[in-house]
Amino acid sequence: MNIRRKNRLWIACAVLAGLALTITLVLYALRSNIDLFYTPGEILYGKRETHQLPEVGQRLRVGGMVMPGSVKRDPDSLKVNFSIYDAEGVVDVTYEGILPDLFREGQGVVVQGELGEKNHVQAKEVLAKHDENYTPPEVEKAMQENHRRPESVYKDKAS
């Protein structure tokens, strides 16, 4: 191999190494800003294809329906505890702040926050469904895939 080819090979290797390093650093920097979307069932059992569970402390968005009878408000503050469900599971959420006007039991919501211990989400933002015709695309897809409710929603409360 002549000297000119060796120099070109070294330059090509250096460019590829620099490109790989740049991509790695960009992905590492963006990792803290990416909020992955999960349903309650995916938090409990993992994503469908990979069965990967979210980690404690991970920022995420959770979409589902507010469980009827689960909304508990603290009388001394703006703290609210409620549960979000889908066909595969239920996740508890804590939020401190003013809830959207359209927030109510049985309605679709998307909460953004951090996953805590025991699959508890500490929400920093709560988004309620806008009107009866609008559903966020991620929530609509997830609800179509599992359009059943957990059995606890159907239990007769009188007995």
From Swiss-Prot:
Ligand binding (heme): H130, Y134
Localization, UniProt: Cell inner membrane
Topological region Periplasmic: 30-159
Alphabetical list of Gene3D superfamilies matching this protein: Nucleic acid-binding proteins (2.40.50.140)
Membrane topology of this protein: Single-pass type II membrane protein
GO annotation, cellular component aspect: plasma membrane
GO aspect biological process, one term: cytochrome complex assembly
SUPFAM superfamilies in the record: Heme chaperone CcmE (SSF82093)
Region (Disordered): 130-159
Function: Heme chaperone required for the biogenesis of c-type cytochromes. Transiently binds heme delivered by CcmC and transfers the heme to apo-cytochromes in a process facilitated by CcmF and CcmH.
Identification of the protein by name: Cytochrome c-type biogenesis protein CcmE
Organism the protein comes from: Citrobacter koseri (strain ATCC BAA-895 / CDC 4225-83 / SGSC4696)
Gene that encodes it: ccmE
